Amino acid sequence: MTLTVTNYPFRDRWNDCLVRRAQYTGPSSYATGGEAIDNIDDFGWGETHTLVGTITDGTTQHHLYLNYATQRIMVFLAAGTQVTNGTNLSTFIGQIVATGK
């Protein structure tokens, strides 16, 4: 996964959870079911609890959804359907906010 994480030491808290803001770049070949989060390497925690964000290529916007059970970032079209398997999202970039422990 391509993430550029921004940390703000000692202020990155939401109740008892850590908060991270990151720039997310979509994969070159999206897999149905989403892109796996490597919690330790991507965010520095054991489990992601929430993730909010959108990605765009400058023309089209997609919504990001965290599948909590599988710890995967899923990408959805504005119509509410998941992006199809094999779709190139490498030109889609956006900001995400995630919480975890």
PLM features: residue spans?
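Extracellular receptor-binding modules and their adjoining Ser/Thr/Gly/Asp/Asn-rich linkers
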Residues: M1-E35, F92-K101
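Extracellular attachment/recognition segments
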Residues: G26-S90
